[in-house]
Each structure stands twice: as C-alpha cells, then as structure tokens.
C-alpha cells in the first residue's frame, strides 16, 4: 500500500463512521486530511513509514492543533523496521501515531488503547494516585512494594507520581497484588501541544513585509511552514482565524494552494486570503487574492475583513 492508498483508506474509514473530511494533497505538508464530527476536529498526517515524519512537520501540526483546539494525529503502517501493531500507540516528536485499524477501533467504539511502544519495548501508564491509595490501604511501604515488584523504591515513587511509563510485566504484577485495574487508557487525541512555540520567523522578505503589516494592524501571526497557507492570523480576542497565503505572483501552484485553503477554511470555520506582489484582485472559490498594495493601505483589521467579505460576496 502506498501513501495515496493509505490516505484513501483512512478517509473512507472516517466517512463510514460519520466524519466529514477534506483531503489536502500538498507535498511535504504537515497534514493530509482534515476531519470533523460533532465537536471533534482532527488534523491527520498519513505516512506508510512513520519514521519519515519530520520534527518540522510535527511542530506545525501541533501549532495548528493549538490554534484550532483540534487534535493532531499520525496514521501509518510501519516504522523503518516493523509494522505498527493493532492496539498499540506510537509517538513521533510528541504526536501520537497508530495504524488505521487502531484508529477505527477508537473512533467506532471509543476503545482507547492501553499500550505504548517506546525504546526498549511496550509500556503502559499507571493510575498513580490510585496506586498510592491502594498501597497505603494494604499497609505496604514503597520499599516493600518495590521488593515485591523487583524494582527500585524510586521507581515506585515515580509510578505514584504518574511519571513515565511502566513495563507490562510490572503493570500485570501490580494488578495481581491489588486485584484491581490500574492501567490508564491512552487518549491519542491529546497530543503534547502545551509547550509548542507559536513564534517562527518569516522565510523571505515578502513574508516579513506581510507579517509586519498584519501585526501593525493588531493581528497575531503564526507562521506555518508545511501547509498550503503561510500563516494563521487573527485579531486579538476574536475567534475567527484567517488562513493567510503569500506569493510573489500568481502561478498554477498558487491557484492550487488557494483551492486547498478554500477547502480547509470551510472545515475549520475560518476565512482565507492570499496576498500577492501583483496588482490584480480576484477570488478563487471563496478565497480572495489581493495585492500587497491593498493590504498596505487598509487602516485596521475591520477594514481588511470588510474587503475580504465584499470580495467573497462578489462571486
């Protein structure tokens, strides 16, 4: 199965369980599918080999998840050495990765996996607070419990603090000792995005000019390197994001990017706009293409959004 076939499989699977999807074919992009069902919004990257996922793609994907209050996910078939196992969660640069079968099991039956693949084997997460309660209830010291498990006292202390993962053998032994489930399911829709930085420098002079202008108008600008748009911009305290594309001139590649942004904007309930170093104004789909000169002349964000609204309604 190649990447295109994998993306098709994932998209059809999502559609079969009630998701609306938008496919985003953009070379080197940080996501290939946008999917939504009720309040769940997913940005999904598909790769046959998840080891080809880059840190730059991961950072962009985490930025998008944070900006849109969405979930970021990697769906693949194998690493460079092994196939991804059913019911097992993998991780690349803070983004959870699963195979299509595992994703279907989660979304169709809300059965979250228990096992995480890390260096050295398979591990699970323990409910540390419950473990401490049970240890104290049964009257074991941390040293006594450590001896029963064949681990160090510091390891038991880490388990109780919820720090790190626990080997499957140790988890089984704990549940045998206390006769109670202690393994916590892994919520793959909660990627580690809390520490992602939203600041990233522009890549060229035109980007810098446009970003500086938008910031002077009072908008925040978050650079996205691996997407059809160059940045996500928004006015402070406003909910609507503006997917902002930038290019020197209109080319077939530009139009293709505009069409992708038009498709994405609908799913993430946002507006789209492209700023070009040209004189002509036009609209592709519902996305206006405006000259940089127009952007330079607007007085505030309200005027910019009014221009975008008027251009959209003119089609």
From Swiss-Prot:
InterPro entries: Arc_TR_HTH, Cro/C1-type_HTH, Lambda_DNA-bd_dom_sf. Keywords: DNA-binding, Transcription, Transcription regulation. Disulfide bonds: none annotated. GO terms for molecular function: DNA binding; DNA-binding transcription factor activity. Residues 142-161 bind DNA. PROSITE patterns: HTH_CROC1 (PS50943). SMART domains: HTH_XRE (SM00530). Residues 131-189 form the HTH cro/C1-type domain. It comes from the Archaea. This is Putative HTH-type transcriptional regulatory protein PF1851.
